[in-house]
Amino acid sequence: MTRVHLAQLLRDLASAHDYAFFSAPDEYMPSEIDRYPAAWLTPPCLKEVEGRRHGKRTYEIQLHLLQPGMRLTHAERARRLDEMEQTLLGIFTELTEDPKVICVERLSIRPRTCAFTNHGEISQSATAEAVVWF
């Protein structure tokens, strides 16, 4: 599995949860995101390789889910953050169902304290390591 296949798999999973998908380095986020809810994938980083012609690769993944956040009550903000956390858990669980994905390790999810763009969105950010066959 290549990083392109992994990104496409994450695109399909995020789209299945009704998120508009975007992928580029984080500095492009303010100019690229034009609709919400949005999923932003930082290009996966190849962290480790085991084997020469076939074996395992470990990719570090950063996936952000964003929703409109202007004028939300504290209760509504907390509810939406909880929804996004559950969605991220679902996406990474579904990712392991692909036959080329061995496992997802070191998954951490945290709410962001400030907006990525000037739209005033709220977001949850997930980082994980995906171990895949090649």
Segments and roles (model prediction):
Residues D34-C45:
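A short, hydrophobic beta-strand-centered structural micro-motif
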Residues M1-P30, P44-F134:
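Charged, amphipathic alpha-helical segments and their flanking helix caps
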